[in-house]
């Protein structure tokens, strides 16, 4: 068609067009039934063709006055005496090629560059680095370095590795992490729980093959765990961490802390060789108590050190609160208490042992090699990797949970965003590079991260200065490390690990918030103490997964009713009352029981799902819908079966006593079911099949087609799935000759300025309008919600009474030159009339077509209905 013909075609009257071009009708766009209460003066219709060739129905109205409900003398505003047009809107359903094009192939090069750049967050903030940041990072780095050196050696002792391996892990963790980090506070290095897991892994592998060296096992474990963690981050799978709740993490962390403390008491008292520290925690405690008579001089070093550590801690905390001027001094004193106690203990040990170096009276650390003597390409054994395969899940879980939970907590406290996927990459890269230094697995440390944050660190570059302190210790202080008492190191470990135990108040809080999660916490601690740390971790993870699946399989869906509410802004006579209907659970959970929640319109069920509609909960939702429908509605035809033998065995006949009088069933027929999908983010094949089965069962019960309406669908793929299963429109297109369309105005409203409008602090009504106080009886007796139909009724209407003498309550744009032409557009696609914006729109649509159908006679549907399957795209029975 040429351009001139297109112009003529556009301006031509549809009646003058050729028969093959003039539309006979537009499906669904017809006047309402004659017995329907009119909201506006009868409109006139004309079909035309838009510029794009789309058939559009234009609706013309005469001007109508709108009055406040119950007060016909006060006009709120008047519609301009101009045309109001409502066009079409067809929303395309998503497709797999379209998704791939949009999310994968669209701007692929730009996406790839952005992804590669995101792997190195240091590129974003390093160009803006300044001297002020440098000063704070230097102070924080040195402070953390003074803590990480004694802790690194102590935790290496927990891991049953030589002390230098703890220093290697400490150096690599703080030096490499800053390149990939999204958290400025986290300090990566040896930690108590991961060191304990490493010791268990070493013991298990050496039990299979004693030829493996402990350091080799620790390095290989770091390689494998780091590779898995880094891979999860590169694939953006960090969300899997969210499947384990906080109580589960707290459970096995508490169990691990108890195990570590129990294992260090024997070293504190000087008889470590008499206690098997790799046994279950309760056995370690029993053996420790049994060997108390074998206590040695080491106990003097250990117990005194432990007492001083706690004394300094609580004294400094008290002085910080009392003398705020010197809180910086007290803070540094508190932070350096572990380093100072080791220095003092080492000096005393040197005085005691310097003349008896070959046979010291106390247990001392011994020789620590200087520098990075073990640095190099590691030798990885395939057999060792195979032996470690069964130990990897526990190691990876501990690495993930400890680090991410610490990073997120400091991100919340200090107001910056932590990216879990990038943190996994950072942790994985740190452990992979640490293999070349013969480091064992490292992750985020809560105690050192807290010190880092309180020291005023500004960027992750503070880890470089911490690494410098570790290097200085490795090259200059290893000679002094020889005389460090093991009892003092045990005191430092017990003091550090004690904070990992969840206090009883937190346990009580778990119980008050979520009793089931509190039980998971208790079970994790119990299994960790009486079995093993590995079993405690598995117990916490499995119970958390079971609880999650249970909640998905048994969603707390609710059937909705209508509650009329009003907002009272002031107590004076100038207050404004806003009355509206809302849909709330019929059981009134969480509401005042004195309120009256009305049932939805007769024959209509409104159900709100609280979870995604997937295979675990499909059967449960099906049972809830069918059970409720058969309770509140009657069967469409009680005599559907001609003979008793025709009735299925699972469909018992109604029972009545002999000679009992016939009682008329006043329950309504089932007309429609409205499903509120506002909380549904996904629906799978099983869920759709459950809906198809539910519809089939209820249609046999009702004796006619039951409409399934869906509201608040927030995912295009859900619409695609429902449409493929035959939902979204009536299956018998000839039966429903009218429907309503939710339309929205393209012009702003100017009647009432609300607090949401700029420059206003309260609602201001036009000066010509008197505002009445709230009338409770009027609110209760008010009628059905606004009916906004395709006849062009304005979407700004508030409510419509079922009494013909009452007027429409609401407001319209005032007379203004800018409102010379009002255009209204469908809010959602008009292709699928059973998809709605909200529950109110769905109820309006059903009432518009059913509520006045007094001669409605349902047709009889036998039990020989053809099986419906979701393979039928039209959903026909």
Curated annotation (Swiss-Prot):
GO terms for cellular component: plasma membrane. One of its GO terms (molecular function) is secondary active sulfate transmembrane transporter activity. It holds the Pfam family Sulfate_transp. SUPFAM superfamilies: SpoIIaa-like. Residues 801-821 have a biased composition (Basic and acidic residues). One of its GO terms (biological process) is chloride transmembrane transport. It is a multi-pass membrane protein. It is found in: Membrane. Its main location: membrane. Residues 594-747 form the STAS domain. High affinity uptake of sulfate into the cell. This is Probable sulfate permease C3H7.02. It comes from Schizosaccharomyces pombe (strain 972 / ATCC 24843).
